[in-house]
UniProtKB/Swiss-Prot annotation:
Keywords: Ribonucleoprotein, Ribosomal protein
Signal peptide: none
Top-level taxon of the source organism: Bacteria
GO CC, alphabetical: ribonucleoprotein complex; ribosome
Keyword field contains Cytoplasm: no
Name of the protein described by the UniProt record: Large ribosomal subunit protein bL28
InterPro entries membership: Ribosomal_bL28, Ribosomal_bL28/bL31-like_sf, Ribosomal_bL28_bact-type, Ribosomal_bL28_sf
Source species: Chlamydia muridarum (strain MoPn / Nigg)
Key word Phosphoprotein present: no
Annotated family: Belongs to the bacterial ribosomal protein bL28 family.
Length: 89
């Protein structure tokens, strides 16, 4: 199943997980040292939702991120869907 948001286009990003040792300078130590770096993925907070579309007069089942759900609450589903179609998501 795709991990891409249908409304905002958010998808997994790549980054690093750092292994750190030492005592921080805030605690009067010498400072934190990075001892290892491992590749990892940052996944978007995805969920499948049934949302009511007033223009189409039916439920739409969408796989969206939490950020997209907040956007739907703010602007309304029909505006967000129109914006997503214009951007090509």
């Amino acid at each position: 199943m795709s991990k891409k948001c249908a409304l905002t286009g958010r998808k997994p990003r790549r980054g690093y997980s750092y292994a750190i040792r030492g005592i921080s300078k805030k605690k009067k130590g010498i400072g934190l040292k990075v001892t290892g770096r491992t590749k990892r993925r940052f996944l978007p907070n995805m969920m499948t939702k049934r949302l009511w579309s007033t223009e189409e007069n039916r439920f739409l089942k969408l796989k969206i991120s939490a950020a997209a759900l907040r956007l739907v609450d703010k602007l309304g589903l029909d505006k967000v869907v129109a914006r997503a179609k214009s951007k090509g998501f």
